Regions:
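Membrane-water interface of alpha-helical transmembrane segments
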Residues: 3-11, 80-87, 110-117
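Alpha-helical transmembrane segments
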Residues: 6-23
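Hydrophobic residues within alpha-helical transmembrane segments
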Residues: 12-15, 59, 88-95, 115, ...
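Core segments of transmembrane alpha-helices
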Residues: 14, 60-75, 124
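Cytosolic, membrane-interface loops and tails of multi-pass inner-membrane proteins
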Residues: 22, 26-56
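Mid-chain, well-packed structural core segment of small domains
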Residues: 66-99
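Interfacial loop-to-transmembrane junctions
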Residues: 99-123
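Juxtamembrane boundary at the C-terminal end of a transmembrane helix
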Residues: 128-139
Length: 139
């Protein structure tokens, strides 16, 4: 495994963010075209139609917990601590974000979203633990 393998789950997550921006644009455009919203409503996110609201909320979620994901991946990369286990767990986190986002922009059922969030959160905790152990070993 190369030292750059930890960067691929980060790239995958960035792809999700791009896809969610595109989906948000499509859903907002459809809402305006259908007369369910005016463009001016989106300036301050007032009374957003449900379809685009779910996409907007899912996009917003990508700038919460995942920020810590990108930081820990970069720290593992910079300290040469991105072994096979760390890369596998990083992929688990990225996959959990895709599942979470898919549920968020479709049914938006908490009982389906929560397990994906929990899996990602556990993966993130594991990555930070791996970084801490790695730093203790190289100190």
């Amino acid at each position: 495994m190369t030292g750059t393998a930890i960067l691929w789950p980060m790239i995958a997550h960035a792809g999700l963010v791009v896809a969610l921006y595109a989906l948000l644009g499509l859903r907002r455009g459809a809402a305006v075209k259908a007369g369910k919203a005016r463009v001016s409503q989106f300036r301050e996110n007032l009374n957003e139609p449900e379809d685009s609201l779910f996409a907007r909320n899912s996009l917003s979620n990508q700038f919460e917990l995942p920020v810590l994901f990108h930081v820990v991946c970069l720290a593992l990369f910079a300290t040469d601590g991105a072994g096979a286990w760390a890369v596998a767990v990083a992929w688990l986190f990225a996959a959990s974000r895709y599942v979470h986002a898919f549920v968020h922009v479709t049914s938006n059922r908490i009982r389906h979203r929560q397990p994906a969030f929990t899996a990602g959160f556990a993966a993130l905790i594991a990555l930070w633990g791996m970084l801490a152990v790695h730093l203790l070993r190289i100190a």
